[in-house]
UniProtKB/Swiss-Prot annotation:
Induction: Expressed only in the forespore compartment of sporulating cells. This is Small, acid-soluble spore protein Tlp. It comes from Bacillus cereus (strain ATCC 14579 / DSM 31 / CCUG 7414 / JCM 2152 / NBRC 15305 / NCIMB 9373 / NCTC 2599 / NRRL B-3711). The gene is tlp. Its main location: other. GO terms for biological process: asexual sporulation; sporulation resulting in formation of a cellular spore. Pfam families: Tlp.
Length: 65
C-alpha cells in the first residue's frame, strides 16, 4: 500500500533546505579564500549553483504558502 501524500510540512522542509544551502554557501566562501586558483574557481561555480537553488527553493516556498 503506498504511503499517503502528506505535504503539510513542505514549506518548513523547504525553508530548512534554504538554510542548509546558505550555510554551505558561507562555509565554501570561507574555504575559497584559502584555496588555490583552480579550487577557488570550482567553489565559486558551485556557489553560483547554490544561489540558483536558493532562488528556486524560495519560489517553491511561496507556492506552498
Amino acid at each position: 500500500m503506498p504511503n499517503p501524500d502528506n505535504r503539510s510540512d513542505n514549506a518548513e522542509k523547504l525553508q530548512e533546505m534554504v538554510q542548509n544551502t546558505v550555510d554551505n554557501f558561507n562555509e565554501a566562501k570561507e574555504t575559497a579564500e584559502l584555496s588555490n586558483e583552480k579550487d577557488r574557481a570550482a567553489i565559486e561555480a558551485k556557489n553560483q549553483r547554490r544561489l540558483e537553488s536558493i532562488d528556486s527553493l524560495k519560489s517553491e516556498i511561496k507556492d506552498e504558502s
